[in-house]
């Protein structure tokens, strides 16, 4: 595990606006991703992730503008994902201030995207986003964890553990592991999935999906994650980044 545990808020951005509800009384505009990013920076976030949920070419410039404005105000690593299909997309996001780029569906459709991006920009730039769920009924994968797309609505039949290991071989620098079963439940991370992923990859794992309280975070690290990512519990002010870090410290983990 890396030395300090990273705590990462995630912002879903649709046509330049944050779409999951955000409740901060001190923000003039809780839907503005730049203002919200600055708030999380003040709270002590280690990194930030923007997910462009529209991700159509017509909205690409909007996201570029958001990243540019954010990078001028915050000085922690910024990851941008959603609709990244080519090395040129990666180049444009890095040029406007992103530090890392996450890929998902496009890499499933063309795994060479991973190696092409890694060779051109370095594997530290590339985050593989895996939306995984437990198979129900008849099992088609060896591990029982299947890769999904379309926000968990579409099955791929691809084993999530196999895919992450393959992506690491191709040059991915990190895995963002999002449990589609736990996502939005606020019942805690899928620890079994994290443990299973830790056994097959050596690159850092960012655990996502299921955080509901500060006490949910240390078990994810104990299971093998190097970083923890959450959205709604931070947006609604249910838990602060400081409270998560305090809980991690109490559990004996180093935080920045």
From Swiss-Prot:
Heterodimer of HisH and HisF. It catalyses: 5-[(5-phospho-1-deoxy-D-ribulos-1-ylimino)methylamino]-1-(5-phospho-beta-D-ribosyl)imidazole-4-carboxamide + L-glutamine = D-erythro-1-(imidazol-4-yl)glycerol 3-phosphate + 5-amino-1-(5-phospho-beta-D-ribosyl)imidazole-4-carboxamide + L-glutamate + H(+). Belongs to the HisA/HisF family. Pfam families: His_biosynth (PF00977). Its main location: cytoplasm. The active site is at residues 12, 131. It is an enzyme of class 4 (lyase). One of its GO terms (biological process) is L-histidine biosynthetic process. The keyword Lyase applies. GO terms for molecular function: imidazoleglycerol-phosphate synthase activity; lyase activity. Keywords: Amino-acid biosynthesis, Cytoplasm, Histidine biosynthesis, Lyase. This is Imidazole glycerol phosphate synthase subunit HisF. Gene3D superfamilies: Aldolase class I. It is found in: Cytoplasm. GO terms for cellular component: cytoplasm.
